[in-house]
């Protein structure tokens, strides 16, 4: 929650200086990802103006962050027997809490084109950065895929995962068509199926 509060303060500072309108790219991890997901949810999944952030988003999120617990929300998901399979994949429980208790119901593909948002996490298999964006998911080692109907809440939960707290997010990688470029700086057209 500390990271979320910190990022809420940073966005407030930017809004007070009329700077939210100048942002073209945002890269987040952990609490920053969770907070930005809630900002988008509060604005109908569009980027807020500085005035909109100060008058609507900031007060709403300040109140919600003081009244709700993401950790207890994730634990409450175990009251549903269908979620028992996630006992060891607690990030999946966090994703369910974001959907059911915080209302984060959009898919990655529903995010706006601007600002370009990179939601970052780490793969358990390689330890490399795994990135979620509006139009792609993946990393340079495993490859990239179109997100399809991938839930924003799942991407946020994966970004917030950490050992001992919320473990890795479990999802079916076989549901995606992965592509990889032969080299980091190769043209996108050179990507081949993995």
Give names to the regions the model predicted.
Residues 95-98:
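Conserved loop->alpha-helix
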Residues 17-20, 102-112:
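Surface-exposed acidic, glycine-flexible loop patches that form ligand/cofactor-binding
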Residues 2-88, 92, 133-134:
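Patatin-like phospholipase
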Residues 22, 28, 105, 122-126, ...:
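Residue-identity detector for threonine
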Residues 10-11, 105-107, 114, 154:
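Short secondary-structure boundary micro-motifs
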Residues 67-85, 100, 111-194:
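Active-site gating loop/helix substructures
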